[in-house]
Amino acid sequence: SGSEVAKIGDGCFGLPLDRIGSASGMGCRSVPKPTPGGS
């Protein structure tokens, strides 16, 4: 499911990935795919 979350980018924080983003602070940037969506 991580792949799907990375694609959304915006959902990175809304989805379970938030746990990694909150701890690392860059869960969305962790994957090169969300680069265009994160911007």
From Swiss-Prot:
It is found in: Secreted. Pfam families: ANP (PF00212). Belongs to the natriuretic peptide family. This is Natriuretic peptide NsNP-a. It comes from Notechis scutatus scutatus (Mainland tiger snake). GO terms for cellular component: extracellular region. Keywords: Disulfide bond, Hypotensive agent, Secreted, Toxin, Vasoactive, Vasodilator. Snake venom natriuretic peptide that targets both NPR1 and NPR2. Exhibits hypotensive and vasodepressor activities. Expressed by the venom gland. Its main location: secreted. GO terms for molecular function: hormone activity; toxin activity. PROSITE patterns: NATRIURETIC_PEPTIDE. InterPro entries: Natr_peptide (IPR000663), Natr_peptide_CS (IPR030480). Disulfide bonds join 12-28.
